[in-house]
Amino acid sequence: MIVCAEMDEQWGYVGAKSRQRWLFYAYDRLRKTVVAHVFGERTMATLGRLMSLLSPFDVVIWMTDGWPLYESRLKGKLHVIRKRYTQRIERHNLNLRQHLARLGRKSLSFSKSVELHDKVIGHYLNIKHYQ
């Protein structure tokens, strides 16, 4: 069981900034770890894949920013929408940008293929959070 989970998405790109690739993930506030993540476009389908990965965890309180798709997907659940309660996951986004140059907004480092982009970020999350 997860008492408080923060959810957010982080922007990245593959090849050119017009080819966006989003990292959606959930962060356990109490354990300070990433619970699940998925890559894809910034759509309801990608959010649905993340929610299906999170369904076995029985999250009590969801904390997100004001993105409208979170509101529609979390209807009927205890859902807090405030920037104040997403500070930890936003800090984690900053840590990811600092540790992985390919996530930097203005960087000469970038991914050239979707597969490599997903594997590098997934491997980093695996080492830091899943082991």
Curated annotation (Swiss-Prot):
Alphabetical keyword list: DNA recombination, Transposable element, Transposition
Gene Ontology BP annotations: DNA transposition
UniProt name for this protein: Insertion element iso-IS1d protein InsB
Pfam families, A to Z: DDE_Tnp_IS1
Keyword Transferase among UniProt keywords: no
InterPro entries assigned to the protein according to its UniProt record, in alphabetical order: Transposase_27, Transposase_27_IS1
Family according to the record: Belongs to the transposase 27 family.
Gene Ontology molecular function, alphabetical: DNA binding; transposase activity
